[in-house]
Structure formats: structure tokens, C-alpha cells
């Protein structure tokens, strides 16, 4: 698969970077809100269920607007790819339970650390159809700088 990671490579790449930045901003907000709802309800599981219900409704609305040609592709899609939803459930359930005890910042620090490690592995091997971006010394150095930066923000 062709490498398309240069954010200066046109309007689409910059738009993608901005969208992902906004998604990243939303993760700790979602974590804090779901965690707080879990405390108010005395049930992190109920808070997670409400988060999933809202997410399902929004996804369903987007699906109704989207091109429907994907339906005929469902039977040929590798079945293991549908397990991705389990990772979402694990994240939302774990952040709802752990964050009130561990702190949003600490929880997100370890989420980011896990994301950096798994993203590097997925990119290096091109897992799940991802574009291959081999792990070089420079990339490892960049990841370590990011890890150190996240650690600094948590310990400042």
C-alpha cells in the first residue's frame, strides 16, 4: 500500500490531520464525561452503555446518509475485523471504571502509551490492511520523544 503520511501533501492530508487532532481532543473529554456519569449513576457500566447508545444512534444516522453499496461487501469481509467493536467496548468500560480511581490524566497517559506501541507495530507489519511504515531508528526516537513528552505533562 502506498505511503501517504506527509501532512503537507495536499488539502486532504491536512484535513485528515485536523480531524484526528479533534478526535484526540475528544478522547479525554469523553473519558471524563463517561467517568463522571458513572459516578453520578453509581455504575460505570451504565455510563458506558449510555455512551454506546448515543454513539450507536449517531453512527446509525451517518449510515443512513452514507452510500449503501457496502452492504453487498459484508459477507466477503474477514470476520475477525468485526471484533473491532470489542476494543471500543473495552476502552469505554475500562476508562469509565479506572479513571475515577486513577485520574483522567494518568488513564489517558497509559492509553496514549498503548496507542503508540500498537500503532508502531500495526504500521511496521501493515496489519489489518494498514499501509506499511517500517519502524526506523528515527521513528523509534520520535515515539520515545512522544512518550517522554506525555510523561512530562503528567509529572510536571
List PLM regions with ranges.
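Hydrophobic alpha-helical transmembrane segments of multi-pass membrane transport proteins
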Residues: 25-29, 33, 62, 79-105, ...
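Hydrophobic transmembrane alpha-helices of multi-pass small-molecule transport proteins
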Residues: 136-154
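Membrane-interface interhelical linkers
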Residues: 2-22, 36-40, 56-81, 125, ...
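Juxtamembrane helix-loop-helix junctions in multi-pass membrane proteins
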Residues: 32-53
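Hydrophobic core positions of alpha-helical segments in small-molecule transporters
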Residues: 50, 110-111, 138-141
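Structural motif at transmembrane-helix junctions in multi-pass transporters
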Residues: 39-43, 94-110, 129
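Hydrophobic/aromatic residues within the transmembrane alpha-helices of Major Facilitator Superfamily
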Residues: 25, 29, 57, 86, ...
Amino acid at each position: 500500500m502506498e505511503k501517504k503520511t506527509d501532512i503537507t501533501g495536499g488539502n486532504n492530508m491536512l484535513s485528515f490531520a485536523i480531524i484526528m487532532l479533534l478526535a484526540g481532543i475528544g478522547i479525554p473529554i469523553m473519558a471524563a464525561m463517561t467517568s463522571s456519569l458513572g459516578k453520578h449513576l453509581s455504575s460505570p457500566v451504565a455510563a458506558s452503555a449510555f455512551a454506546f447508545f448515543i454513539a450507536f444512534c449517531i453512527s446509525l444516522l451517518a449510515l443512513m446518509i452514507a452510500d449503501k453499496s457496502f452492504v453487498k461487501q459484508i459477507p466477503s469481509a474477514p470476520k475477525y475485523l468485526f471484533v473491532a467493536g470489542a476494543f471500543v467496548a473495552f476502552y469505554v468500560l475500562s476508562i469509565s471504571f479506572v479513571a475515577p480511581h486513577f485520574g483522567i490524566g494518568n488513564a489517558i497517559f497509559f492509553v496514549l502509551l498503548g496507542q503508540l506501541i500498537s500503532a508502531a507495530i500495526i504500521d511496521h507489519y501493515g496489519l489489518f490492511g494498514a499501509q506499511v511504515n517500517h519502524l526506523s531508528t528515527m521513528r523509534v526516537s520520535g515515539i520515545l520523544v512522544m512518550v517522554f513528552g506525555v510523561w512530562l505533562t503528567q509529572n510536571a
